[in-house]
Amino acid sequence: MGLRGCGDMKLWTFLVSLTIEDYVKPRYGQPVNIRMVLRDDTLLKAYPEFERLTLYAMYSPKRGTAGYYNPATNGMVVSIGNPSDDFQYQIEGVLLHEIQHLIQEIERFAKGGDPKTLGRSRYHRLAGEVEARNICARHFLSQEDRRRTLRTETQDVPDLKQIIL
């Protein structure tokens, strides 16, 4: 399950959003070391491939808070609307979502996709996208709630309606 046998997704977490914001905002458009936003190196131990990941942050008023991972360049882009926008938990959620896509790539799990090529409805139903959104939803639950709640109770598309590419 997930982290090469580690099981509990809570093993890898990010620094609090304000700390990430203080580090990332002055570096928009520049490569950011993923270590600088992780609480500890548990993720890097489980997935040494992340050491080579290039993380970029950018402003994009049209896109708002969004992100994407490009396996061809091993780059991850995290976008937030405007320099004055408050990060709160937005960047943390985008990082979780996009990191899950990289884990899917490494583990050869069901992958996500691009709504521009698949259409919004099919994209929303892709098993990799459902999993990545569910990782975010579960991350913000307490550890006790996460243990009590099945993944099927927090995912936004039932298993039988998901598309696996």
State what each model feature region is.
Residues 30, 34, 86, 122, ...:
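Charge-dense, low-complexity intrinsically disordered segments
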Residues 89, 105-129:
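Post-HEXXH active-site segment of zinc metalloproteases
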Residues 102-107, 139-143:
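A generic secondary-structure signal for well-formed alpha-helical elements
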Residues 49-92, 99-106:
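Active-site scaffold of zinc-dependent metalloenzymes
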Residues 28, 109, 143-147:
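Surface-exposed helix-capping loop/turn segments at secondary-structure junctions
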Residues 1-66, 72-73:
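A metal-dependent hydrolase signature that marks the N-terminal structural subdomain at the beginning
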Residues 95-99, 127-129:
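Alpha-helical architecture
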Residues 120-165:
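Active-site or metal-binding loop neighborhoods of secreted/extracellular toxin and effector enzymes
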